[in-house]
């Protein structure tokens, strides 16, 4: 009887240890897939964005390495073009599910663009699929995909066409065309507010516009009035339009609440 009772206690202890181990693994599951001592380096940042958890996604200046960094500065993962997930990443955003979307560009003969696409990665940086693909005109050096906006379960991306800008929503499987004159030659990049269905764009000559149905788009910013200003990437959030000014090394902030 005593031997049997002792055996029961051993089984109970083993079960308790097993349960504790499982709980510890579950509680520290993110840590288990993270090496907090692993260094990460990049010479310069080509593009960066954040998510709702405070994580930062960085594309280095080679456009061939992407890093996910936690809010407290830990490297969660990194993926490289050599892993065959992408070719040359130019933009990165993360949706509400943690999936990551890259604006991927295939370049030939130094600067000529052969094709572009939107590549979807998992929350761990692993390739899932290519959700969009755009063939470029022969000899083209200008991008056709000109912006991305994350949604809860997907991404909205903006693409230049002959008649204007096509805004596509992968979550809803829908698209909408905005008629913008000479979009192929004029537009550098775009931002989109899905709540108000508003499109904003930066032109190659340094102007920022808001699209209007009238055909006369509203001028919001003119770099000719600010010495040295060169607006580039733009994004929209809560009534404010932001643009990275690579000439002044500053952020242009345009409040649109009154517009």
Regions found by a protein language model. Give the residues of each.
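Short, solvent-exposed loop/turn segments at conserved positions within beta-propeller repeat blades
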Residues: 61-62, 109-114, 160-162, 246-247
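Surface loop/turn motifs at the tips and blade-to-blade linkers of beta-strand repeat domains
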Residues: 37-43, 80-84, 132-141, 178-183, ...
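Beta-strand-rich domains and repeat architectures in extracellular enzymes and scaffolds
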Residues: 37-64
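Conserved beta-propeller blade signature
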Residues: 56-58, 100-101, 155-157, 198-201, ...
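Residue-level detector of Asp-centered blade-edge/turn motifs that repeat once per structural unit
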Residues: 50-53, 94-97, 150-153, 193-196, ...
């Amino acid at each position: 009887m005593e031997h049997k009772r002792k055996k029961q206690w051993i089984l109970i202890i083993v079960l308790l240890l097993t349960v504790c181990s499982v709980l510890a693994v579950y509680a520290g599951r993110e840590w288990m897939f993270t090496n907090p001592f692993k260094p990460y380096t990049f010479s310069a940042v080509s593009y960066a964005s954040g998510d709702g958890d405070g994580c930062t996604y960085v594309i280095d200046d080679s456009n061939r390495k992407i890093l996910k960094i936690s809010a407290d500065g830990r490297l969660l993962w990194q993926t490289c073009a050599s892993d065959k997930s992408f070719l040359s990443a130019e933009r990165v955003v993360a949706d509400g599910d943690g999936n990551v979307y890259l604006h991927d560009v295939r370049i030939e003969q130094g600067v000529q663009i052969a094709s572009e696409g939107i590549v979807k990665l998992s929350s761990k940086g692993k390739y899932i699929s290519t959700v969009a693909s755009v063939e470029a005109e022969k000899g083209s050096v200008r991008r056709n995909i000109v912006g991305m906006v994350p949604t809860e379960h997907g991404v909205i991306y903006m693409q230049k066409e002959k008649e204007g800008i096509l805004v596509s929503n992968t979550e809803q499987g829908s698209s909408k065309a905005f008629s913008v004159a000479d979009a192929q030659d004029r537009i550098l990049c775009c931002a989109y507010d899905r709540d108000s269905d508003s499109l904003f764009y930066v032109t190659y000559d340094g102007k920022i516009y808001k699209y209007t149905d009238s055909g006369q788009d509203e001028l919001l910013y003119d770099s000719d009035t600010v010495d040295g200003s060169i607006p580039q990437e733009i994004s929209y959030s809560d009534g404010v339009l932001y643009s990275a000014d690579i000439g002044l090394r500053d952020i242009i902030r345009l409040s649109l609440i009154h517009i």
